[in-house]
Each structure stands twice: as structure tokens, then as C-alpha cells.
Design a protein with these regions (language model features):
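His/Asp/Glu-enriched, well-ordered alpha-helical/loop segment
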Residues: 75, 214, 279-285, 291-376
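Active-site environment of divalent metal-dependent phosphoester hydrolases
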Residues: 63-65, 99-109, 140-141, 186-190, ...
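Active-site gating loops and adjacent loop-to-helix segments of metal-dependent hydrolytic enzymes
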Residues: 61-80, 89-92, 120, 133-154, ...
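N-terminal metal-binding scaffold of metallo-dependent hydrolase/deaminase domains
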Residues: 1-38, 49-51, 377-384, 398-399
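Histidine/acidic residue-rich metal-binding segments in metalloenzymes
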Residues: 164-261, 291-311
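Divalent metal-dependent hydrolysis catalytic cores, especially in the metallo-beta-lactamase
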Residues: 83-109, 120-129, 173, 177-190, ...
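C-terminal cap of metal-dependent C-N hydrolases
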Residues: 8, 346-348, 364-401
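Metal-associated gating/positioning segment near the N- to mid-region
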Residues: 49-115, 133-140, 203, 227, ...
Length: 401
């Protein structure tokens, strides 16, 4: 199968190559030329439009629908899986062709995407995050009921002590994980859990990293806490998710140790502005936590950016509705990034972090994961927040929007 996009403007980082012709053959960008390309192909007129790499969301939860686990207890388990189908389409329609799922998706989704059973982003899996007893996302209720979903092929993540975290790391690998996610601080959505408190001890964290590294897997930390971030950096983690209370000293330490930051600025702002369902008995507690986080998050991430921390685009989609992914780019610009740097955080920089050396740029011999938009996001990246401005999405050379 061949597709020819004619007279299109190509965006790679800060560069705009005008009036280019691009031949896509099978799943690869075969040729880029300013001259006409002769080919027996489906032709798309790209005049006055802009072609970018498909975006990579480095922090998503494709199965999640607000993480209202009470609904999972009330509904048939099958709905948990079927929800992922519209979530996947919403993600594609937002211009995201690859996601890094930080907890909830299983191997079945990855296989279904690879087999093209439905339109969906490519995915890197963490399966279930590792969480200590009483920690963030330990879903035990005061009643004693456990809301954590488990089924064959999807192990629980709760673990304590060196031996248990070692075994759970191996179980996630066995279940199909591409990387390991660890809840290394308290969070907003879990009651009786403060974002400022570190979770898991240093021996546990180092054990997780040692075992993951032996399997060529990176380890990622949900972490708001300053102490928690330092524990994770010392243990050898590859990324910090959220990083709310980061300071200059810790940012410098991240740079020195090549630790990336996925700030997910969108999620806290979105939740703070839109609130929680009326039936959520813990809504007031969550809003109080959000108030503290929103107050300092952007300011602190701006410090991290100024110190040279490698910042990647991630949204926590699933905690908030899917399909808002590229709104994160506007928040990245607000912390000091240029439009091109924000775009790079969700394309070439994200691809490098995922060890995908053939993604993230519009270049010959790269995988044809691409989006066509109706105006230049280097002038105003917020145009990517409106999914109507994303005219076409290609994944592996196939037109999926």
C-alpha cells in the first residue's frame, strides 16, 4: 500500500520544510522530495497544511475511566476492557499514535493493537503499578473490601519488603510489562495518603531497579514527594512522573543521573477546575490536595526545566477524559518551553526515551506515524488542543483518521 502526500509543509523540531512531497510505502516514509514524486499511490493534497510526527503520550491509562473503582465493582468485568476501545479512538483522534501506559492496561490490548482488531495507539505496558500496603493505590476500603482488579494474566501490585518487590517485578515482566511503574509517594486520588510523603524504602526501590535492569526494563516512579524523588534517583529510576515538589537541587541531581521528568501538568489543573463526581465521598479531601499541588506544580517544573531536566509529554489520561492529550503542550509552553521544545517533548524526545530510534521525526526510513494539521503549531502550539485541527492521523502508514 502506498500513500503520497503532496505540497505539504513538514515540521521537524524548529525547521519547516515547505511544499514537500512524501511517499509512504507500507509502514515507512519511503521518500521526501521537493520535486514531484511519481507513484501509483493514494494521493492526499497537503497544500497549506503541516505534517508532524505522531505524538507519544508518556503517561496514560488507556483502560481507566476516571479511576472510579467503585464502578468496576458494580459492573461486569468485561466493561473494563470494552471501555478501552473508545478511549483508544479518542487518543488517536487527538493525534497520539503511541502511549506509555502507567497502569491498568494488559497484554491483551497490546496484542489487539498489533493485530489491528480496532484503531488504537501503540502501547508500552507497565501492567499493574507496584504499591506498598497502605500506599497510593492500595485500594483497600475502610470496610475491608479490596477494589483492586485482578484476573488471570493481571497480577496485583501490592507488595512489601525486598522479597515481595522482587517477586512482583518478575510477575509484571511475566505478564508482559515493558517497564515497571512504582508508586513512590502518596497521591491525590488515594485517601489517607499525602503526596508529600515518600513510599517504599531505599532497599525495596533498589531491588526493583536491579531486577528490572537485569531484564532491560526501565523503572518509573509516580512521585510528588521531594524525599521520594531523591530515593528514586539514588536507586536508579529512569523517570519521575508528576514531580510536584521538585526543587533546584533535585533537578540538578536528575540531570546528573539522566533521569527524565513527566510532569503531567494537565491532569491536576483539569481535576481542580472540573472537580469530582457528586457521589465521591472523598471529593473534598482530593480537592484540598489538588489546591496545594496546583499552587506550586508549574512553578517547580519551571525550575526543573531551567536546570536542564529532560521533560517529556504525559497527561495522565484516564484520570481525566481521554482525547485531551495535546492540551499538555500548552502547559509545557507556560513553564518556559518554546513551541518546538514542547512538540519535541511529545515526539522525538519521547521516542528517544522509549528507545524507538525510528519514531518521532518526519524523515526517510522512519515509521510513518504522522499527523496532518491545518495550521502551524510553531506559531501557536495551542492549536493542537483542538482535535478538529488535526485533519489526518497515520499509523504505520495507514490512515486512521
Amino acid at each position: 500500500m502506498k500513500t503520497l502526500i503532496e505540497n505539504v509543509n513538514i515540521i521537524n523540531l524548529e525547521e519547516v520544510e515547505t511544499n514537500q512531497n512524501i511517499l509512504i510505502e507500507d509502514n515507512v516514509i519511503k521518500e521526501i522530495s521537493s520535486s514531484k514524486i511519481k507513484a501509483n499511490a493514494n494521493v492526499i493534497d497537503g497544500e497549506d497544511n503541516y505534517l508532524l510526527p505522531g505524538f507519544i503520550d508518556c503517561h496514560a491509562h488507556i483502560f481507566a475511566k476516571g479511576f472510579h473503582k467503585e464502578e468496576n465493582m458494580a459492573n461486569p468485568l468485561g466493561l473494563h476492557f470494552y471501555n478501552a476501545v473508545p478511549h483508544a479512538l479518542q487518543t488517536i483522534n487527538a493525534g497520539v499514535t503511541t502511549i506509555r501506559d502507567c497502569g491498568s492496561a494488559d497484554l491483551s490490548f497490546k496484542l489487539a493493537q498489533q493485530r489491528k482488531l480496532f484503531i488504537a495507539p501503540k502501547i508500552q505496558l507497565s501492567i499493574s503499578p507496584l504499591v506498598m500496603t497502605g500506599g497510593h493505590f492500595d485500594l483497600f476500603l475502610p470496610s475491608g473490601w479490596d477494589m483492586e482488579i485482578i484476573y488471570p494474566g493481571f497480577p496485583k501490585g501490592r507488595c512489601d519488603g525486598v522479597e515481595e518487590v522482587l517477586k512482583k517485578t518478575r510477575e509484571m515482566k511475566r505478564a508482559g510489562a515493558d517497564f515497571i511503574k512504582v508508586m513512590a509517594s502518596g497521591g491525590v486520588l488515594t485517601t489517607n495518603s499525602s503526596p508529600e510523603f515518600a513510599q517504599f524504602n531505599k532497599k525495596e526501590l533498589k531491588t526493583i531497579v536491579k531486577e528490572a535492569s537485569a531484564n532491560d526494563m526501565k523503572v518509573s516512579a509516580h512521585c510528588h514527594s521531594l524525599k521520594g524523588m531523591n530515593n528514586c534517583i539514588d536507586a536508579g529510576f529512569s523517570s519521575i512522573e508528576h514531580g510536584t515538589f521538585i526543587d533546584k537541587k533535585t533537578a540538578c541531581k536528575m540531570v546528573k543521573n539522566n533521569v527524565s521528568l513527566v510532569p503531567t501538568l494537565l491532569v491536576h489543573q483539569f481535576l481542580y477546575e472540573n472537580g469530582f463526581p457528586a457521589w465521591d465521598n472523598y471529593a473534598s479531601e482530593k480537592v484540598a490536595k489538588l489546591k496545594e499541588i496546583v499552587k506550586v506544580h508549574k512553578e517547580n517544573i519551571s525550575v526543573a526545566y531551567d536546570e536542564g531536566v529532560n521533560i517529556l509529554m504525559g497527561t495522565d489520561s484516564g484520570v481525566i477524559p481521554h482525547g485531551h492529550n495535546l492540551e499538555e503542550l500548552t502547559h509545557l509552553v507556560e513553564i518556559g518551553m518554546s513551541e518546538s521544545q514542547a512538540i519535541a517533548a511529545g515526539t522525538v524526545k519521547a521516542a528517544e526515551f522509549l528507545n524507538k530510534d525510528n519514531l518521532g521525526l518526519v524523515k526517510e526510513n522512519y515509521i510513518a506515524d504522522l499527523i496532518l494539521v491545518n495550521s502551524n503549531p510553531l506559531d501557536d502550539v495551542s492549536i493542537l488542543s483542538d482535535n478538529d485541527n488535526i485533519l489526518n492521523v497515520f499509523q504505520d502508514g495507514v490512515l486512521v483518521k
